[in-house]
Amino acid sequence: MQVDKEILRALNQVLGQALIAINQYFLHARIAKNWALSELNEKLYHQSIHEMKWADDLIERILMLDGLPNLQELGKILIGENVAEILRCDLQLEYQKTDIIKNAIALCEQQRDFVSRKLLVKLKDGSEEHIDWLETQIELVTSMGIENYTQSLLDS
């Protein structure tokens, strides 16, 4: 199935964001595990796996459209050096990723590619859910203080 090159470029941009997220969340999960923050480790590890599944869906869609998935275009990974920074870095990534997804959705609507649009809406919804979780965690850090927040995440 042939499709507009702009759609393929947009899908590859979203794929690039998913690849960044896989690596960033995985590294942050392992940092949290090293700090004995099992709850944060588990959440970020599962988010990394979700991103991997979304990347797989994007790869399949790009291939279906006779495109070539670009797995080499990795952007900058934002690594936090403490819990608050980890949350802020992940939130920044999600904001950036969501903006790129929204632009891709608009392009799909313009080009009448509703199958790609449906996939992208699913990814956007997942990103917005994660944004809500991250914003809540940052609010908890602010209201509880970083020490109490971190203590609440420690292994029992």
Short names for language-model regions:
Residues M1-S156:
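Iron-associated oxidoreductase/ferritin-like identity signal
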